[in-house]
Amino acid sequence: NEQAVIAQLVDNLRRLNYNDALYDIFVVADNCDDNTAQVAREAGALVHERFSDEGKGKGFAMAWMFERLFKMERKYDAVCIFDADNLVHPDFLREMNSRLCNGERIIQGYIDAKNPTDTWVSGVFAISFWIVNHVWSLAKYNMGLSCCLGGTGMCFDTEVLKRYGWRATCLTEDMEFTIQAMMENIPTTWAHDAIIYDEKPLTFMQSWNQRKRWSQGHFDVA
């Protein structure tokens, strides 16, 4: 249920510094019981509604949407994934297109904080992501090592998705797909200038619940 934020993201994506004839904006309204689908349509997105009592969660919704996407008449070179509460830098698609033209097939963008000054919790999250982005992800990319997907701001060559499918459905589907790709000798690369602004938790309890979910997902992948 993302009716409060989805229009802002769709409007943001329509204003990127990229030929709007070369990309489409899809919204997956997964088991929503609010007005997410209607709001997204009114904002200009192509909305696909999914209702299922089995296979709940982001990973299952992505697999479902990819299957529908590949059956469409219009074909796409790549797919980018964003969370509903994100904002995207105007040059995001330009940066990703450059990486794709360079032969990179799975690419993670720079996840920045959308609300670093809201509370001390969101501030700590922002600092931790800034450190990881520079000291971990950028460093690994410069050393020729595979990076890790971050759940949003991800870009995939569609041929990779068609060939291997999307089989990542645990709580941390990003980590799961990163490992699956590495087992096929496909590294995840890093686009330092392809920036996404992600909303961070405001309270300690929100942070606790999110971290607990991530920890469970990482344990499942291991």
Model-flagged regions — what are they?
Residues 1-10, 31:
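Active-site beta-to-alpha loop of glycosyltransferases that engages the nucleotide-sugar donor
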Residues 11-22:
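Short, acidic, metal-binding catalytic loop of nucleotide-sugar glycosyltransferases
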Residues 29-37, 52-54, 87:
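A conserved acidic beta->alpha catalytic loop
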Residues 34-35, 82-99:
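Acidic donor-binding/catalytic loop of UDP-sugar-dependent glycosyltransferases
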Residues 49-74, 91-171, 208, 212-222:
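Long helical/loop segments within the catalytic core of UDP-sugar-dependent glycosyltransferases
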Residues 79:
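Short aromatic/hydrophobic "clamp" motif used to bind/position activated sugar donors
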Residues 83-87, 167, 181:
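The conserved acidic donor/metal-binding loop of glycosyltransferases
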Residues 169, 178-196:
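Catalytic donor-sugar/metal-binding loop of nucleotide-sugar-dependent glycosyltransferases
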